[in-house]
Amino acid sequence: MAQIFNFSSGPAMLPAEVLKQAQQELRDWNGLGTSVMEVSHRGKEFIQVAEEAEKDFRDLLNVPSNYKVLFCHGGGRGQFAAVPLNILGDKTTADYVDAGYWAASAIKEAKKYCTPNVFDAKVTVDGFRAVKPMSEWQLSDNAAYMHYCPNETIDGIAIDETPNFGKDVVVAADFSSTILSRPIDVSRYGVIYAGAQKNIGPAGLTIVIVREDLLGKANIACPSILDYSILNDNDSMFNTPPTFAWYLSGLVFKWLKANGGVVAMDKINQQKAELLYGVIDNSDFYRNDVAKANRSRMNVPFQLADSALDKLFLEESFAAGLHALKGHRVVGGMRASIYNAMPLEGVKALTDFMVEFERRHG
């Protein structure tokens, strides 16, 4: 079968080696004669999977010992509610920085539980969309925390700065689309959360990193399944967890460690992004309207100069094994999501196709 490269924003491409191992173990895992999907989440075999996955994840991001790692349900949208329900405490307001679609979605959900102080960080610079630097973010004095999204998948906008607002500011961040793609200083955050379906594993799992002093503050109305303290006290098994997603994510963590960890991912992700943006920037046929300082390395939206060619581009690229390139309905055009599992070979195949498509239709 011809090589297929999946540029979907999520569920996203998984490492071929991981899929091969999962396929081999699907019906007979660990010599048990059953699938990992069929074993008890409280049995010693799966407990080992869970413990190894957490250890490997901690190793990859160098998570400090005073942070808890939770394996949860609910996705990023679940965390839009979980963060205020767990972290507000006796306060009624929180700072929210709006830099795109997902930040705005978090703000909308937070309004159910608190009064968000919203700072619009979006700006236009020389005709390109950009984000104001953190030094210009206006935070309030009485906020329980500050929330932002470092990578906007739909807009193709990234905020690569590391927060430095002082020890009294609890920073909560939605890392769903950029987790494990580069090193991060976890100690600068109070809460980090990430849906698994982009850089971690299959959909159905959400990972939360929470500083332990923030536990025990949950609103009385917080559903138990979203309560960080309850999840922590029950080793993320307050109810039956998504065991297969947990197992596969653990395999991805081992794949990452075997391939140089987040430092190596950082390097290759930069190479992939430079290759794709280079073709776009050196062409009048393609365009990207995000300022270079805020371009995402994970999600690259681009438009054709003649939108009438969009349908043909998508049809021909799909036939060439380049799948899921249609842009989000909010922005249109094309979008290539190039997460950790997307090899440089896949991006090279895309750029070769783009050059040839321009030659024939430009």
From Swiss-Prot:
Reaction catalysis annotation: O-phospho-L-serine + 2-oxoglutarate = 3-phosphooxypyruvate + L-glutamate; 4-(phosphooxy)-L-threonine + 2-oxoglutarate = (R)-3-hydroxy-2-oxo-4-phosphooxybutanoate + L-glutamate
Cofactor: pyridoxal 5'-phosphate
Keywords: Amino-acid biosynthesis, Aminotransferase, Cytoplasm, Pyridoxal phosphate, Pyridoxine biosynthesis, Serine biosynthesis, Transferase
Positions contributing to L-glutamate binding: 9, 42
Subcellular locations according to the entry: Cytoplasm
Residues given in the record as pyridoxal 5'-phosphate binding sites: 76-77, 102, 153, 174, 197, 239-240
EC numbers on record: 2.6.1.52
Pathway: Amino-acid biosynthesis; L-serine biosynthesis; L-serine from 3-phospho-D-glycerate: step 2/3; Cofactor biosynthesis; pyridoxine 5'-phosphate biosynthesis; pyridoxine 5'-phosphate from D-erythrose 4-phosphate: step 3/5
Domain of life (superkingdom): Bacteria
UniProt-listed GO biological process terms: L-serine biosynthetic process; pyridoxine biosynthetic process
Gene Ontology MF: a single term: O-phospho-L-serine:2-oxoglutarate aminotransferase activity
Comment on bound cofactor: Binds 1 pyridoxal phosphate per subunit.
Entry's Gene Ontology cellular component terms: cytoplasm
Function description: Catalyzes the reversible conversion of 3-phosphohydroxypyruvate to phosphoserine and of 3-hydroxy-2-oxo-4-phosphonooxybutanoate to phosphohydroxythreonine.
Summary of subunit composition and partner proteins: Homodimer.
UniProt record similarity statement: Belongs to the class-V pyridoxal-phosphate-dependent aminotransferase family. SerC subfamily.
Matching HAMAP family: SerC_aminotrans_5
The protein's name in its UniProt record: Phosphoserine aminotransferase
